[in-house]
Structure formats: structure tokens, C-alpha cells
């Protein structure tokens, strides 16, 4: 990821985010369309920043809930078989275990959220199952 992209993110979200941008999200890049940044904040809590048009693949969290606290920009969240929900700073999404979903930025906006992994009580193993990319045509229809 080049300096220009990082500078764009800082300029676009700098005033609206109290959290660090983090580093290029290379560890999970194969599960994303576009570039993202990851800033671990504490055990199971991270700030994730998406460039315009960036989104993660459909995926499922096994053995844990995921809570997204939107902190800047404009993005999308969608559960399999449901319409996409537009997200803005202040929105909170509570994703139950075993729910197939994706989330990411709008086409024309940087987007950032805090992702919180919450293990299910009594469940010893947590994992993410990464699935197919979000269909470009369907994503392109989002306003």
C-alpha cells in the first residue's frame, strides 16, 4: 500500500476518528476487495478502516458474536438473504454467531468501524469462515 492511499485515509477520516488508522491489513487482504487498515486496540477489539469501495468477503463467525461500532465515513452491512443496511458514524451492528454477512465502505466514502469479537459463553473455539467475494454487480447497485 502506498503513502498516497494512507494520506487519503488520514485526510478523509482524521478529524472524525479518535482511533488509530493502523497498518495495511495484509494478513487478511485475500479476504477483501480493495485496501483496508487494521489497528488492534485490545484483545478481540480492533479499528478497521476501508478505502472507498473496499469490502470484506462474505464470512461467518463461529463461536462468537461480532459487534461493529461505526466511527466514521459511510459503509454497508448485509446479512445473507437480507437487504444491505447503510452505516454511518454512531451506528452499531450486533452480528450473532453463525450469520453469513459482509461489511465495508460505500463506493464513494472511506469507512471505519471498531470490530469487537465476543466469544459465546461455554464455547471453547472461535473461528472465521471466509467465503465468496461480494458480487460486484450487487455491490454496484448500492446507493
Regions inferred by a protein language model and the residue ranges of each:
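Short hydrophobic/aromatic-rich beta-strand segments that constitute the beta-sheet cores
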Residues: 39-40, 77, 113
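Conserved short histidine dyad/triad with adjacent acidic residue
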Residues: 46-62
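A short, N-terminal "cap"/entry segment at the start of jelly-roll beta-barrel domains
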Residues: 1-44, 128-143
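A short hydrophobic beta-strand segment most commonly corresponding to one strand
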Residues: 67, 94, 108-129
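Residue-level recognition of conserved beta-strand positions in structured domain cores
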Residues: 47, 60, 71, 79-81, ...
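Conserved metal-binding segment of the jelly-roll/cupin
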Residues: 50-53, 87-108, 118
